[in-house]
Amino acid sequence: MARYIGPKHKLCRRVGRPLCGSAKCPALKRPYRPGQHGPGRPQKLSEYGAQLLEKQKLRFIYGVMERQFRRYFEQAQRSRGVTGEVLLQLLEQRLDTVVYRLGFARTMAAARQLVGHGHVTLNGRRVDIASCQVKPGDVVGLTQKARSLAVVRESLDLRRPVPPYLSLDETTMTSRLQRLPLREEIPVDVDESLVVELYAR
């Protein structure tokens, strides 16, 4: 599956906020577009510009390329429920996202790498596809080798709160997706209705 391999902090600065999960993200000090010599006078975005910005933010947060993102949107459109909320649920059901929410990795990119290197199991079977959809009732876990990895231990030591829709057994390092997340349980500062409006144009 294709992925963005360019400079991550450049994306953060493009949207004006840290999306990479790093505490040292340059966007915290310089929340303006890269290439500008200083913040300058803020420009008012057009309606299309605001919609595009929200879509790009969502794509960058989850590390999804445009073609795959559109597929998620089309799937959300076909599903019952509010399209924007269903879109977020589909993105939250990605295996790499679940691994990140469980605190097994510090960033979404690190979670994707953990999955890609075969350190994650789904219902007892090793899976190396980050975009694999986790369904309610599925059990996500770490391989025996992954449990002793320094990067995993360091991430778990941060003690990030686990969302209420996931149950984590710290003894076995496994988690069950109890249900689909509610909108207020998804910690993403994005107006998904603007994304829906963009694709409806």
UniProtKB/Swiss-Prot annotation:
NCBIfam families from the UniProt entry: PRK05327.1, rpsD_bact
UniProt keyword Membrane present: no
Domain of life according to the entry: Bacteria
GO molecular function: rRNA binding; structural constituent of ribosome
UniProt-listed InterPro entries: Ribosomal_uS4, Ribosomal_uS4_bac-type, Ribosomal_uS4_CS, Ribosomal_uS4_N, S4_RNA-bd, S4_RNA-bd_sf
Its biological purpose: One of the primary rRNA binding proteins, it binds directly to 16S rRNA where it nucleates assembly of the body of the 30S subunit.
Family per record: Belongs to the universal ribosomal protein uS4 family.
Membrane-crossing residue ranges in chain numbering: none
Assembly information from the UniProt record: Part of the 30S ribosomal subunit. Contacts protein S5. The interaction surface between S4 and S5 is involved in control of translational fidelity.
Keywords: Ribonucleoprotein, Ribosomal protein, RNA-binding, rRNA-binding
Any one Gene Ontology cellular component term annotated for this protein: small ribosomal subunit
Residues of the S4 RNA-binding domain: 93-156
Protein name, UniProt field: Small ribosomal subunit protein uS4B
UniProt xrefs under Pfam families: Ribosomal_S4, S4
Organism in which the protein naturally occurs: Symbiobacterium thermophilum (strain DSM 24528 / JCM 14929 / IAM 14863 / T)
Gene symbol of the encoding locus: rpsD2
Gene Ontology biological process terms in this record: ribosomal small subunit biogenesis; translation
RNA-binding recorded as keyword: yes
